[in-house]
Amino acid sequence: LLVVNQRLKGTFIFMPSLDSTQDRFAGSEHKGVRRGVRDWTELMLKDHGFLRLYWHNLHRIDEMMWRSNQPSPSRVKQAAKRGIKTIINLRGSRDDGGWQLEAEACVTYGVTLVDFTARSRAAPTKEMVYGARDLFATVTGPSLMHCKSGADRAGLMSALYLLIHKQMPVAVAREQLAFKYGHVKQAKTGLLDAFFDAYEPFEANGMAFFDWLDNVYDPDILQNSFMSRGWANRLVDDILRRE
């Protein structure tokens, strides 16, 4: 279905391939029906897609980048009609119905799908941040970033996009991690806020972000020093069922 075009640090970029799509479905129509039912069941029930039928958490970051929660195939179609050329999936490639349907929709509507793995409950690694920098420098055309709910990983990457690619102040970038997007900083997901908080005083003293990342930042220290709150973790993990 998809052909690997390029690999960045932790990133796989897939381009539409008509020939491989034909090969996948050739002579297996009955199997395709069963697979399609399974994929839609996983997307709607296991992945809580029914909650996203009318709630898309869709927001424009700037003229070239949008953020949202996990799109359905119909939303991929709508994005393509709006001029979106690249969809960045922050959940990484997965062997489940949601990923399969998204990948197939991207092939159908001529959208490039990028799989990039970001974490919502861990201090960002230096490798991930550099991978994000390379990704932002590589993608072409209007793009859409998404995770499952569009709250935490989408917020992290949106903030990095503004900080790294658009060279905005950390105070502006950090606004992408906000409750209005569904982000709860009192939970373990607050590690993402702590990451930007840790850089802010060094920015005030004139230190460039990547100088701080290379010479000062220690993800283990940040991880071990962060204290989340039990009620917030129960909300995010048990009630909202975030990844």
Language-model-detected regions and their locations in the chain:
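Substrate/cofactor-recognition hotspot
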Residues: 150
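Cys-dependent protein tyrosine phosphatase-like superfamily
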Residues: 4-143, 156-243
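Short cysteine clusters
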Residues: 147
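Active-site adenylate/phosphate-handling loop in enzymes that bind or generate adenylated species
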Residues: 153
